[in-house]
C-alpha cells in the first residue's frame, strides 16, 4: 500500500459495529497526522455515509460532493471517530483538498471533541 496521508479516502472494513455505529465496508476519511500514518500500525478515520437525509443539520457532518473520488454526494461523520488497524484499509479512492480538511473537517472534529473553535474573524 502506498503512503497513507491525512485527507485520503479509502474503502475500509469497520467490522460489525453495534447500534448506530457505522459498520461493514465503507469509505472512510483519514484524519490521523502523517507522522502517525507513517509509523503506527493503526489509523484514525471518520466514516462516510451516503444517507444524506440523516446528515442534514448536524454540525459534526460535512457534506462532500465531487471530491475525494466519491461517486455520490456523501457526508463525513466526525462524531464517529474510530481507530482501526491499517490492514482494514482496502482501495484508495481519492483525497480531499487541504482547504476542505482545514475549514470543514477540522471544525467538525473540534465540535465533536468540544475543542475551541475559531470565529469568522479568526479569533477564538
Residue ranges and their predicted role:
Residues 1-2, 53:
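Short linear motifs in intrinsically disordered
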Amino acid at each position: 500500500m502506498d503512503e497513507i496521508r491525512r485527507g485520503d479516502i479509502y474503502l475500509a472494513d469497520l467490522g460489525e459495529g453495534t447500534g448506530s455505529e457505522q459498520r461493514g465496508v465503507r469509505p472512510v476519511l483519514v484524519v490521523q497526522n502523517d507522522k502517525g500514518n507513517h509509523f503506527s500500525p493503526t489509523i484514525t478515520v471518520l466514516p462516510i455515509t451516503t444517507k444524506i437525509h440523516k446528515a442534514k443539520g448536524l454540525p459534526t457532518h460535512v457534506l462532500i460532493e465531487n471530491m475525494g473520488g466519491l461517486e455520490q454526494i456523501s457526508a463525513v461523520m466526525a462524531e464517529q471517530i474510530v481507530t482501526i488497524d491499517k490492514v482494514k484499509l482496502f482501495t484508495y479512492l481519492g483525497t480531499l483538498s487541504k482547504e476542505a480538511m482545514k475549514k470543514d473537517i477540522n471544525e467538525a472534529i473540534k465540535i465533536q471533541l468540544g475543542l475551541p473553535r475559531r470565529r469568522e474573524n479568526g479569533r477564538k
